[in-house]
């Protein structure tokens, strides 16, 4: 008997916004999604703030979204967990952080990370807490290596953050900026080692662009037409010498909490086996605020991983179901590692399909990305009649939305519409069913209605939730859902009991 697959199609960064201006989704031609919405029940679900375990009003992101979707419960995110520990005071007695501070008394403390309150990869409040702790512990030499954002924040907001941290350091009485690098270099995740090398050279070798202050470095970049994301790695100088390069035995605290864009620069700084580029042979006391990758050695983890039992993937495997996880490079970790609750190993019966993302500087240059190739390969896999459950992510609305180009984002959305149409036709033909949704908003909110400025960050808008399949044509959906209700809905569609760890609910009205 042919399998009747249940598919979960995640249109990354595809939110709902009633305003049309600056809304690449509303401005796109989406005949397939329009038709599907007419034929099948659909609603909106929440994908930000408290609904996904983030602080109230905090925009969602892909890591958080996929973790909540796969877990079937609200997962309290590292941002919330760490911020709470600062408020409670536990942060300042954290064993690993204390050890780093003790080591730095004889040496120096380098604090590196994304200078942002975007809350996606890091939070500026965590940096301030580390500086305060250093002062309280008697550390004299504290150097900040700032990575500038411009993706999860306004494209030219780095000066504000730099001033805020400078004011904080002045008030606390310790700390100075040593280097500044755009996240494009310091936080690459696509093995573009030549980018990472520039950030490494600035921090360790004191080689790169030069400036007398972080403000000067940022302003030079703006004058050169480069926004925060693309600030060239720059060494801050004092008396013709770098303010503070990383030296043997220094302590380093990397205050990013999201792993994917923290891994490469960490590997460059700590791994003995490394072939990305030539490095200095130095050993340091290196702290990752959270676990970036279990395979990275020579690091200390300040906030270890939370374990999630019975995620959707694990539970389906226990029930003997086969599954396919499909995405292009940019979102591959999201449909595997994050969807599985931070577990790298595939479940029994879980196959993975990775399509390389195109090698372009920014995705507005190729808004189709690898969606067509991904769709063709996924259609082949559907034809194999071997999968009970399929998760597929289209990266386009998010990755192109981040570029700020509405024109390119429209192409991205229209590409996804075409691809979703093909997949749904095939799934329905097989007698299967599907949920079409998103992990967070982005492409629907690309202009600030008040200032008219380009927005490159995610949004706090709800996302679509469409249930497709012959037996659901006249079904009713519950309102007020959230991402953690998706897994229980899928189990409902697969006629499986929900495990007790899942606190979400099926959104199909009984």
Curated annotation (Swiss-Prot):
Reported cofactor(s): Mn(2+)
Keywords: Glycolysis, Isomerase, Manganese, Metal-binding
Pfam families on file: iPGM_N (PF06415), Metalloenzyme (PF01676)
Presence of keyword Metal-binding: yes
Domain of life where this protein originates: Bacteria
GO cellular component terms listed in the entry, alphabetical order: cytosol
Similarity comment text for this entry: Belongs to the BPG-independent phosphoglycerate mutase family.
One of the GO biological process terms: glycolytic process
Cofactor annotation remark: Binds 2 manganese ions per subunit.
Reactions catalysed according to its record: (2R)-2-phosphoglycerate = (2R)-3-phosphoglycerate
Pathway as given in its UniProt record: Carbohydrate degradation; glycolysis; pyruvate from D-glyceraldehyde 3-phosphate: step 3/5
Active-site annotation: 62 (phosphoserine intermediate)
Keyword Metal-binding recorded: yes
Quaternary data: Monomer.
Enzyme Commission (EC) number: 5.4.2.12
Origin organism lineage: Bacteria, Bacillati, Bacillota, Clostridia, Peptostreptococcales
Job of this protein: Catalyzes the interconversion of 2-phosphoglycerate and 3-phosphoglycerate.
Protein name: 2,3-bisphosphoglycerate-independent phosphoglycerate mutase
